[in-house]
Regions:
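A short helix->loop->beta-strand "cap" motif at the edges of active sites that frequently abuts
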Residues: 102, 162-164, 190
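Active-site phosphate-binding strand-loop segment of PLP-dependent enzymes
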Residues: 109-179
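N-terminal small-domain helix-loop-helix segment of the aminotransferase-like
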Residues: 1-67, 249-250
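Short acidic capping loops at alpha-helix termini that bridge into adjacent secondary structure
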Residues: 56-62, 81-82, 190-191
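Generic structural signal for small/hydrophobic residues in well-ordered secondary structure
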Residues: 6, 23, 45, 62, ...
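Conserved core segment of the aminotransferase class I/II
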Residues: 21, 190-256
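Short beta->alpha connector loops at strand-helix junctions that form conserved
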Residues: 87, 106-111
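Conserved PLP-anchoring active-site segment centered on the Schiff-base-forming lysine
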Residues: 78-97, 124
Length: 256
């Protein structure tokens, strides 16, 4: 049988020409940039996301990383609690949780629920010990199923009720063609960390640029991520950050 590898999700498409040209034009940029990311890029990402999500995000909410995967790993290291992980899921969530010494609470999803957990299934996990901290990983559109979560409001109510933090992995969100993508941040922005980047829609997986958008209500967590980032990757490649400004300020709807 043929085995399809979904671990990397390598895009078969080329990077838009204007973004490639922006990288060429900024190849000379050789200075360390601010650890949280180039100010102009964070501003562009915040404005782009605010329009997409209909919520007012600020540059201060944005953390630029060398791929969203690295930022997720830092989150696992920092988080003191248990990880609620739907199954099946992307290959690196569980190993990162183990490396971060966090216990995994796995929820086996079902076809009838579109391969996403229900609110009651999440609540059942939390009720085992309400005194613990919980972090839910929600990947929609999903790798490997390709499905979109349709019970976002139900899950958001559980998040609000039990102070559940949600990592919303939206790396494939620009590649939803059958229906308009909806983020769980539309229902509970104060509990949601948005994770995405250039790898999929832009075809720039090898450039290694991703970002977190962390709401003001989770500032303590954001500041802790910044501290860890400063002691690990320090800053993302300067030429790539400058080039990425074009990705979030120009219209690429025809490309997508």
């Amino acid at each position: 049988e043929k085995i399809f590898k979904f671990g990397f999700g390598q895009s078969p498409f080329q990077i838009p020409t204007d973004i490639v040209n922006a990288l060429k034009d900024n190849a000379y940029q050789n200075k360390y940039l601010p650890m949280q990311g180039l100010n102009e890029l964070r501003d562009a990402v915040a404005k782009y996301t605010s329009v997409k999500k209909d919520y007012n995000y600020k540059p201060e909410n944005v953390i630029i990383g060398p791929g969203s995967k690295e930022l997720m790993f830092l989150l696992h290291i920092l988080f003191d609690g248990e990880i609620i992980l739907p199954a099946p899921s992307w290959v690196s969530y569980a190993p990162q949780a183990i490396l971060g010494r966090n216990k995994i609470q796995s929820i086996q999803t079902k076809r009838e629920n579109n391969w996403f957990p229900t609110g009651s299934e999440i609540e059942e996990v939390i009720l085992k010990d309400k005194n613990k901290n919980y972090l839910l990983f929600l990947n929609s559109p999903n790798n490997p199923s390709g499905q979109i979560c349709k019970n976002l409001e139900e899950i958001s109510e559980i998040a609000k009720k039990y102070n559940l933090i949600i990592l919303s992995d939206e790396i494939y969100s620009e590649l939803s063609f059958d229906e308009e993508f909806k983020s769980i941040s539309s229902y509970c922005p104060e509990k949601t960390i948005i994770s995405t980047g250039l790898s999929k829609w832009c075809g720039a997986g090898g450039w290694r640029l991703g970002y977190f958008i962390v709401p003001d209500s989770l500032n303590i967590l954001k500041n802790s991520i910044n501290v860890l980032a400063s002691e690990t990757f320090s800053a993302v490649s300067a030429p790539i950050q400058y080039a990425a400004i074009t990705a979030y300020t120009s219209d690429h709807s025809i490309y997508i």
